[in-house]
């Protein structure tokens, strides 16, 4: 069993495995597992079954026991052109050897030279990766900033439009005087005399007044 390879998943565990460890009860009782500490310098760590270390991502050619064809201080553009020209010349030489003398030991030497040129060229290109990553991040952040500025400008434009509509609506409202009762206009109504006489006859005091008037008329 010890000789069997350990099966390691290439994907993280399902969320339920983490949720069970970080419940409210575990957090309240300080039972939730703490995150692992960052690896120390030059420490090897495993992630999804693959070994990693904290060494520089782009190691020098000398540390890999590879012959360096480019100087320490150089112009990358010029050196890339030189390597490209050397690669083309060696490739043409290899073709000549394959045509004239395929069994010549120089054929193997040319293949090794071409391989070494490719390694140096790729190493030189890989040294641009940090700069490329920074430039990509800068472009991405500038794009996000521009999108946010445009969104804020559109929001401000719509806000000004809404304010204009609200101000126009307030301006269209009628202006009322302070003397108006309950904010409404006074309405004058006139009562028909016939309706007034009919209402008076139904009043009990009207009958008493009428009897008194008849008595006064009889005395006279």
Curated annotation (Swiss-Prot):
Component of the Mediator complex. Interacts with MED21. Belongs to the Mediator complex subunit 7 family. It comes from Drosophila melanogaster (Fruit fly). Component of the Mediator complex, a coactivator involved in the regulated transcription of nearly all RNA polymerase II-dependent genes. Mediator functions as a bridge to convey information from gene-specific regulatory proteins to the basal RNA polymerase II transcription machinery. Mediator is recruited to promoters by direct interactions with regulatory proteins and serves as a scaffold for the assembly of a functional preinitiation complex with RNA polymerase II and the general transcription factors. Required for activated transcription of the MtnA, MtnB and MtnD genes. This is Mediator of RNA polymerase II transcription subunit 7. One of its GO terms (molecular function) is transcription coregulator activity. One of its GO terms (biological process) is regulation of transcription by RNA polymerase II. The gene is MED7. Its main location: nucleus. It is found in: Nucleus. GO terms for cellular component: core mediator complex; mediator complex. It comes from the Eukaryota. Pfam families: Med7. Gene3D superfamilies: 6.10.140.200.
């Amino acid at each position: 069993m010890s000789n069997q390879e350990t099966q390691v998943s290439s994907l993280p565990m399902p969320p339920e495995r983490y949720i069970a460890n970080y419940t409210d009860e575990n957090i309240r009782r300080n039972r939730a597992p703490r995150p692992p500490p960052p690896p120390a310098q030059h420490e090897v760590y495993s992630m999804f079954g693959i070994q990693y270390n904290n060494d520089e991502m782009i190691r020098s050619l000398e540390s890999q026991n590879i012959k360096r064809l480019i100087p320490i201080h150089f112009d990358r553009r010029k050196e890339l052109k030189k390597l490209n020209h050397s690669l083309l010349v060696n490739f043409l030489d290899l073709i000549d050897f394959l045509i004239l003398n395929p069994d010549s030991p120089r054929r193997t030497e040319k293949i090794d030279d071409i391989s070494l040129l490719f390694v140096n060229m790729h190493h030189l290109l890989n040294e641009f990766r940090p700069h490329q990553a920074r430039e990509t991040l800068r472009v991405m952040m500038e794009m996000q900033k521009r999108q946010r500025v445009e969104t804020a400008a559109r929001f401000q434009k719509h806000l000004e439009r809404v304010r204009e509509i609200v101000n126009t609506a307030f301006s269209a409202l009628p202006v009322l005087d302070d003397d108006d009762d309950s904010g409404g206009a006074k309405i004058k109504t006139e009562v028909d005399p016939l309706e007034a006489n009919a209402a008076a006859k139904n009043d009990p005091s009207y009958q008493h007044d009428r009897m008194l008037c008849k008595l006064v008329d009889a005395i006279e």
